Amino acid sequence: MSPSYEDLLKKAYTNITEPTEFEDRFTVPTARAFIEGKTTVLENFAEIASTLRREQDHLMKHLLGELGTAGKVEGTRAVFSGKFEQEQINTIIKGYVDDYVICSECGKPDTRLVKTERVLTLKCDACGGHRPVRKRKAIVDPSAASKPTEGAIMDVTPQFLSKRGDGVVKIDRYTMYVANAKPGQTVKIKITRIAGTIIFTERVD
């Protein structure tokens, strides 16, 4: 006997995942960072880790790796050696959320990191999905090589502006800053320094 319309409707409603309280109020705090001498201070580090429901050590390790620097947690703050823009840190945190927080199946943040047999897995409490944690590759800018090197000269086209007014180019996992360049404007630059995933340049045209 085939199931009735009412039975099918009931089953469909059962499979619908209701929004959780965590999902309803999930908003990643904007990083509040400032330069202090030769260091950069992320003053709301603890708040960000708490909102993401991730261990501070795990988030800090990711930030240090992406910035390519040393640092430490001081109370509710994180302190990094070197000078980094607030926008750079926000970009890295967004990548962390995509890789280690958001479920790739339902797009919800109700997840946990679970390590089984040396494999770190992201498990979703909302839909039951799970996946091995892997860094997602950013969209590669076809106008540039995927592995930039210091001293390289290339043509790039900024995609948007930083708060300081510099042009910003995303190349794979790298963020490049170009002075005096507007979005959509192709310019020739030389890579002067690479710090982690941040590329510093100078104009050569």
UniProtKB/Swiss-Prot annotation:
Cell cycle: present as a keyword of the record? Answer: no
Which residue positions does the secretion signal occupy?
A: none
Q: Which GO terms describe its molecular function?
A: translation initiation factor activity
For the keyword S-adenosyl-L-methionine, the answer is no
SUPFAM superfamilies this protein is in? Nucleic acid-binding proteins, Translation initiation factor 2 beta, aIF2beta, N-terminal domain, Zinc-binding domain of translation initiation factor 2 beta
Gene3D superfamilies referenced in this protein's UniProt entry, alphabetically: 3.30.30.170, Nucleic acid-binding proteins
Question: Locate the TRAM domain: which residues?
Answer: 147-205
Q: What keywords does the record list, in alphabetical order?
A: Initiation factor, Protein biosynthesis
Q: Which PROSITE patterns is this protein grouped with?
A: TRAM
Q: What Pfam families does this protein map onto?
A: eIF-5_eIF-2B
Identify the NCBIfam families for this entry.
Answer: aIF-2beta, PRK03988.1, PRK12336.1
| Function field | eIF-2 functions in the early steps of protein synthesis by forming a ternary complex with GTP and initiator tRNA.
**Assembly, per entry:** Heterotrimer composed of an alpha, a beta and a gamma chain.
Family label: Belongs to the eIF-2-beta/eIF-5 family.
Q: What is this protein called?
A: Translation initiation factor 2 subunit beta
Organism annotation: Methanoculleus marisnigri (strain ATCC 35101 / DSM 1498 / JR1)
